[in-house]
Amino acid sequence: MSSSVAEANHTEKEESLRLAIAVSLLRSKFQNHQSSSSTSRCYVSSESDALRWKQKAKERKKEIIRLQEDLKDAESSFHRDLFPANASCKCYFFDNLGVFSGRRIGEASESRFNDVLRRRFLRLARRRSRRKLTRSSQRLQPSEPDYEEEAEHLRISIDFLLELSEADSNDSNFSNWSHQAVDFIFASLKKLISMGRNLESVEESISFMITQLITRMCTPVKGNEVKQLETSVGFYVQHLIRKLGSEPFIGQRAIFAISQRISILAENLLFMDPFDESFPEMDECMFILIQLIEFLICDYLLPWANEAFDNVMFEEWIASVVHARKAVKALEERNGLYLLYMDRVTGELAKRVGQITSFREVEPAILDKILAYQEIE
């Protein structure tokens, strides 16, 4: 009896054990199946994400390659820039350096603006301006917000251009940003002139810019600052003024300032020892100044006459050029080339003045002075 009970208990335990093992196997099998399906879904999702990011990476790489090609094209197009390896736009700003052009300066650069460079220039110029000026001195007047904003843009662009033209300025910055500053100066100046308010302040800013650029053009480079250039730095600043002179408001004042500088320089050379160390630099400066006046007159005088022309300013710089010619005449015994070049300038001026009927409104005495040189070339 007892043995049969023991066998029954043993059999019951074996069945319970088998049932437990079966349940465990089923549970394990179910968990393995669930895990494998989850892994499969994760794998498919991960593979899809990988393909998507791989496609994006390919698109980004193509975009980078395209931008690099555009940059190479931009650099290669700047054939005769001041620093060809660092050129970054297609404006041809320093083409025809020191060469007479048969067209109006500025046409080659029209519709070649690089929007990215323009935005970068404005940000950089404003950032540098904030370092120099306090907001307390630059408060905007609520009654004239547009005028003050454009006036501020003009001041910022002028300050930035003058900073670029300094002797210790970075070479690549000068070649990359100088034409951007010129473009912004033109845009702001035209808007300010069209507003017709407070032009005295605008004229003061422009005159200051011209004076500083002329000083930089005639400042000799120190021995330890000589840059590896094929042409004197003064000729690049000369070309910069020549570009700025395409705008009548700037060009006429540039001729006036340059002719005055020629008169002062001629007086200094008259009493200077020709063996003085600074004589060669002053001699070179004289030729650069005379050449610059000739460029401005030959390039722009006729186009200026077709625009809003300031006859009062015209009379002033005509008289100043005549006075400069007289000052140079005193140097004829020292260097007759000065007078020959100035006679050529006055001759070109007289020929162009004679072609423009609108100049008949100018004071006759002023015209008589310049027309007297019409036969001199």
UniProtKB/Swiss-Prot annotation:
Keyword Cytoplasm: yes
Gene encoding the protein: MPS1
S-S bonds: none
Residue span of motif Nuclear localization signal: 117-124
Tissue: Expressed in roots, stems, leaves, inflorescences and seedlings. Strongly expressed in meiocytes.
Keyword Ribonucleoprotein: no
Localization per record: Nucleus; Cytoplasm, Cytoskeleton, Spindle
Stated role: Involved in meiotic spindle organization in meiocytes thus regulating chromosome segregation. Required for formation of meiotic DNA double-strand breaks (DSBs) during early recombination processes.
Protein name, per record: Protein MULTIPOLAR SPINDLE 1
UniProt keyword annotations, A-Z: Cytoplasm, Cytoskeleton, Developmental protein, DNA recombination, Meiosis, Nucleus
Consequences of knocking out this gene: Defective in early recombination processes leading to the absence of meiotic DNA double-strand break (DSB) formation. Reduced silique elongation associated with fertility defects involving both male and female gametophyte abortion due to aberrant meiotic products. Produced multiple uneven spores aborted in later stages during anther development, due to abnormal chromosome segregation and unequal bipolar or multipolar spindles in meiocytes.
Gene Ontology BP terms: chiasma assembly; chromosome segregation; embryo sac development; male meiotic nuclear division; meiotic DNA double-strand break formation; meiotic spindle organization; plant-type sporogenesis; pollen development
Superkingdom, taxonomy of origin: Eukaryota
GO cellular component: cytoplasm; nucleus; spindle
